[in-house]
């Protein structure tokens, strides 16, 4: 069952969308490429970071670069713990993994790592927003 919808310009709705991407990333759907699931892991973090920026009343560009979004969060006065900053490496799944021939196929261990990282980032963002 989908979560309660909120207005699209609220941190709550961005967190809902991040949680939806996490659910998709975790689902090992038969016939799905692992790189497609990793794309959703990246999207989870992107949307969760954007929820934090909205919460801190900061605008953001519609970009996929997690390092840039992390920098914007820190510029808002909120330091990112090292284990959260570590998730910026998921940016590579925003484009390369979605199209044939851009990169090597994702391995099971890489997928599991991406899911763990995005899950950790989403939990941190929820904590920042007090949205448990």
Identify what each model region corresponds to.
Residues 1-132:
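Terminal alpha-helical segments
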